[in-house]
Amino acid sequence: PFPQYGCAVHGAAFTAPEETADRVLSGFTAPDDGLVHIGLLHGELTGSDSRYRPLTTAAVAASGLHYLALGHVHGCTGVLRIGSVPYAYCGCPEGRGFDELGDKGFLAGQVSPEGAELQFVPFARRRYRIMEVDVTDGDPAALVSAALPAGAEEDIYRVVLTGSPAAPVSPER
């Protein structure tokens, strides 16, 4: 607890390659002590088996938390609700590969007993993007250059060439 800040943070480490049971929220209820109670967990909301600390909607709803910050999903869900408990996967601050496209960042705002008012704040220095370029009847290098948007050097691109070029493509160009 951090009474000087009016809150308590409840969490647990992910200490093994797999956590196949919810040993954190199952049976947990935040005390009614006047503090704002925030849960901070790496876990997966699922009704089925998971290797990544499966969390049930029933356990979340019964937790009495004022907000549950979840990690595992690398895309931001925005603030959602299970029962009276607001929760979100905030995503990750930087994409790590082409399976994590688009804006990455964090959630910032206020959590109170009445709810969570949080906004997504873009943070990533670079975004991963996939772009298709039809190279039929043209110079592939010129077509790719023309297709790249202004500021493309700020991001990381996978360029997928489609179609049939008029001449063989040389990797040196």
Describe the role of every protein-language-model region:
Residues P1-A88, C92-G105, Q110:
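His/Asp/Glu-rich metal-coordinating catalytic cores
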Residues P113-R173:
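Accessory, non-catalytic peripheral segments of nucleic-acid enzymes
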